[in-house]
């Protein structure tokens, strides 16, 4: 699955005591280029907050800037704190937070000296464990609102253009598909054609870079949309106030830009998970990173439009996790390694691999912090559950590879790689090492 998913809906309705001037170029620049890290179709960029570099999810599906984790930072100064309540996906209960004003945000010479930030204290909302890197917050509308912003998923870079840069507009008009968007509650919406079962429907969708799935559809908002007959029940993620569940199914088709995708995987959240969500008029779903990452996309909020051009992944199949396992990062552990230098190179052995009872003179020891991965959820009836894998198991090896040398993304890519692939999983459960074997099976 795509663990992030639900976080990505923030529905904040608040009053403001002053107007922010917004992001602008610090120097006389035509553009700024920001490299990003992409994990599970999500975009993570470094931004300095009052001088401290933090990692933010770049999310068109949110309005305000949110901080929810500072675990990897010794100290971050926030100014003018005011206690508030936030409500969002998961349940009707509000979450305690603080609003902070007059903060300075800066990335690559793109700066806002008067930025409002919302700080969430509930550490259960921290999703760093799901993506495997420290993530401190989310930034949305205020990053996009005054400039032309390019997201190049192939090159993994965000480019922000100065409003006077006319050359780039001429270029994109020649090579990119233009579509009108409406900015409602400071989030971009557009109309497209959705076919779940047979009947096409013109549908209003949120363009949501903070949703790692391809498509989310809310059946409660579109009674004439038919849920496909073959579905799987899934844990979709965590919202402001609790876990979010729903179903996944293959739809007939979905159109974005000049491309109509056949048999994409649609996600259908349970109605109980969206009870507290206030939808804009006529909206029935979201378009997420599972589709957007197949394109190069320009967001032009000042002109209320977007531009898209197919990228290298345009024809990639829509796969899903066939194992039924949800894996999360569960901290770090010290791993002892010995290595032998050979003509300027080094052969590395873990303590398990060397296992000689003594060290040779030319072997050296080093200690490294390595990630721990644990099973966070096991889908009912999945091949992994039937094999015996349980929630809470710590992953030791996958197909002979030490788990601590992998990333969450490589693990997830393996678990959705191809039907029939054999997975040999070595886990540790309450001090006992167990091995399970199963084959990936597509049920959609």
Q: Which ranges hold each PLM region?
A:
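Bacterial Sec-dependent N-terminal signal peptides
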Residues: 1-24
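Pepsin/retropepsin-fold aspartyl endopeptidases
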Residues: 18-444
């Amino acid at each position: 699955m795509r663990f992030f998913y639900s976080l990505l809906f923030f529905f904040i309705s608040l009053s403001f005591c002053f107007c922010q001037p917004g992001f602008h170029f610090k120097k006389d620049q035509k553009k700024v280029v920001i490299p990003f890290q992409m994990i599970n179709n999500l975009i993570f960029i470094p931004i300095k907050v009052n001088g401290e570099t933090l990692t933010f999810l770049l999310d068109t599906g949110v309005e305000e800037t949110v901080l929810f984790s500072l675990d990897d930072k010794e100290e971050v100064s926030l100014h003018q704190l005011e206690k508030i309540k936030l409500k969002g996906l998961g349940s009707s209960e509000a979450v305690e937070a603080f609003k902070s004003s007059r903060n300075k945000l800066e990335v690559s010479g793109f700066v806002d000296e008067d930025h409002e930030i919302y700080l969430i204290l509930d550490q259960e909302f921290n999703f760093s464990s799901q993506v495997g890197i420290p993530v401190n917050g989310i930034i949305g509308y205020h990053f996009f609102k005054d400039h032309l912003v390019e997201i190049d998923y192939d090159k993994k870079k965000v480019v922000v253009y100065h409003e006077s840069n006319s050359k780039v507009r001429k270029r994109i008009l020649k090579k990119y598909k233009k579509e009108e968007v409406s900015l409602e509650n400071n989030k971009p919406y557009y109309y497209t054609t959705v076919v779940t079962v047979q009947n096409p429907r013109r549908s209003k969708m949120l363009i949501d870079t903070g949703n790692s799935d391809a498509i989310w559809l809310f059946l409660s908002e579109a009674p004439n949309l038919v849920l496909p007959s073959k579905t799987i029940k899934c844990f979709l993620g965590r919202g402001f106030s609790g876990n979010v569940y729903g179903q996944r199914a293959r739809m007939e088709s979905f159109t974005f830009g000049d491309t109509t995708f056949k048999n994409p995987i649609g996600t259908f959240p349970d109605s109980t998970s969206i009870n507290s969500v206030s939808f804009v008029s006529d909206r029935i779903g979201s378009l997420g990173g599972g589709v957007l990452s197949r394109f190069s996309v320009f967001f032009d909020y000042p002109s209320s439009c977007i531009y898209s051009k197919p990228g290298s992944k345009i024809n990639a199949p829509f796969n899903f996790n066939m194992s039924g396992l949800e894996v999360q990062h569960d901290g770090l552990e010290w791993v002892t390694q010995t290595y032998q230098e050979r003509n300027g190179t080094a052969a590395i052995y873990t303590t398990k691999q060397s296992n000689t009872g003594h060290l040779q003179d030319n072997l050296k020891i080093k200690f490294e912090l390595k990630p721990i991965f644990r099973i966070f959820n096991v889908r009912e009836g999945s091949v992994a559950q039937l094999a015996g894998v349980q929630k809470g198991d710590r992953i030791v090896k996958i197909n002979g590879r030490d788990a601590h040398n992998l990333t969450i993304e490589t693990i997830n890519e393996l678990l959705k790689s191809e039907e029939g692939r054999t997975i040999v999983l070595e886990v540790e459960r309450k001090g006992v090492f167990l091995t399970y074997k199963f084959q990936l099976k597509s049920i959609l």
